[in-house]
């Protein structure tokens, strides 16, 4: 599926092909929550890094979080004009890019189940909107974004 996204002010527009377009993964870690999660969580999708096309790249900046005193290799791209979170790239998985669902303008499919992860970092004010079929994890689940899509038969060609 072709995902098209943008920042709030329109200075940055991008597109990327994603075989895994379902916005199912709700991350409650402090990094996602504070950089992109207005509801107490952020939703990352998965795309093919080789297909990422960015217009207005001169208006992007990168934030790399510190975790336990070490700089994370994950590069969180955001608009330097309006601060919209756009995507995450991690050189440990150079074939992937993870756009934030909040930056996607394309219609996304509704997931049949959701995964709530990093719940050990969730603040008390955040209420989990969990459905019966949803899965909840204190940390990271063992299943990747691609594996979740494959298990449910939702991979796109």
From Swiss-Prot:
Pathway this chain belongs to: One-carbon metabolism; formaldehyde degradation; formate from formaldehyde (glutathione route): step 1/3
List the GO biological process terms: formaldehyde catabolic process
| This enzyme's EC code(s) | 4.4.1.22
Co-factor(s): Zn(2+)
Entry binding sites for Zn(2+) 1: 7, 9, 79, 82
* Domain CENP-V/GFA intervals: 3-134
Its EC top class is lyase
Q: Which positions are annotated as binding Zn(2+) 2?
A: 27, 29, 32
User: Gene3D superfamilies from the entry?
Assistant: 2.170.150.70
> Which reaction does this enzyme catalyse, per its entry?
S-(hydroxymethyl)glutathione = glutathione + formaldehyde
For this UniProt record, give its keywords in alphabetical order, as a comma-separated list. Answer: Lyase, Metal-binding, Zinc
- Molecular function (GO) terms listed? metal ion binding; S-(hydroxymethyl)glutathione synthase activity
Looking up PROSITE patterns in the UniProt record yields:
CENP_V_GFA (PS51891)
The cofactor note reads:
Binds 2 Zn(2+) ions per subunit.
Give the UniProt family note: Belongs to the Gfa family.
**Role this protein plays:** Catalyzes the condensation of formaldehyde and glutathione to S-hydroxymethylglutathione.
**Mind telling me what this protein is named?**
Putative glutathione-dependent formaldehyde-activating enzyme
